């Protein structure tokens, strides 16, 4: 038999260890030919444990200034069609909405939840997302703070948890130790284009397995910034424009000098 349980919003905020234990036992009839009424028996109690995780995002510029008002959405596919819906939490963070409540499954399918919102960095530049599962996510900046340009490409996050090989032999209470959830690892694949230079990098995020947390800093750099799409043409146009402006300035000086001599 399979037993399914859905975590509520409060449970989703309690990430990492000790996890959430569910105790279950089956009731059965002692008479296989009976319709279920009368004497019954029970299987021994069985305990299972599950874990959720959180992502701590810090939005800054390259001078460590915390940026308020950056907007993000989270997706489970690279085409950015399957949004991971979130709603506001009590502590100014965001809680993942289970797709089961909108006719989907996990992070796929279903309709937009009535409480879903876009994530926005607070006055401290922070965004906290609770209730994440392991897997690959795409974090898309939809709007940058005033004076900055948003990241053109989503940040690809990969949350990986290492569990004991004997997870089916779970002992009640072991979720609070490293016997079950042994390690949490998260990587971020980031694409950058800044001052004419394109860069792709894979970053190992700082994690806390006990808290089930991963820490990501998203930086908006101060300076000239060109989009990756069509960047060569844009760079050529800007260079040519600079040359034309410089030429006009030199021509203007020469014209002025000629008039003065006359």
What are these model-predicted stretches?
Residues 1-262:
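Solvent-exposed loop/turn and edge beta-strand elements of beta-rich ligand-binding domains
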């Amino acid at each position: 038999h399979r037993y399914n349980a859905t975590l509520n919003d409060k449970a989703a905020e309690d990430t990492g260890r000790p996890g959430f234990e569910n105790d279950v036992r089956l009731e059965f009839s002692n008479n296989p030919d009976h319709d279920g009424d009368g004497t019954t028996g029970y299987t021994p109690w069985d305990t299972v444990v599950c874990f959720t995780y959180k992502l701590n995002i810090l939005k800054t510029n390259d001078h460590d200034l915390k940026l308020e008002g950056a907007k993000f959405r989270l997706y489970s596919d690279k085409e950015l069609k399957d949004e991971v819906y979130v709603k506001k939490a009590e502590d100014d963070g965001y809680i993942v909405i289970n797709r089961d409540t909108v006719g989907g499954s996990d992070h796929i399918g279903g309709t937009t939840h009535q409480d879903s919102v876009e994530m926005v960095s607070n006055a401290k530049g922070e965004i906290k997302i609770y209730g994440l599962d392991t897997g690959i996510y795409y974090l898309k900046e939809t709007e940058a703070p005033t004076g900055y340009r948003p990241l053109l490409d989503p940040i690809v996050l990969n949350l990986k948890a290492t569990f004991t090989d004997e997870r089916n032999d779970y002992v009640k209470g072991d979720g609070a130790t490293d016997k079950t959830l042994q390690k949490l690892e998260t990587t971020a694949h980031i694409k950058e284009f800044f001052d004419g230079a394109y860069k792709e990098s894979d970053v190992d995020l700082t994690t806390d397995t006990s808290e089930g947390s991963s820490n990501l800093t998203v930086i908006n750099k101060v300076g000239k910034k060109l989009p990756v799409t069509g960047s060569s043409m844009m760079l050529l146009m800007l260079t040519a424009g600079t040359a034309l402006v410089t030429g006009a300035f030199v021509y203007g000086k020469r014209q002025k000098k000629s008039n003065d001599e006359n």
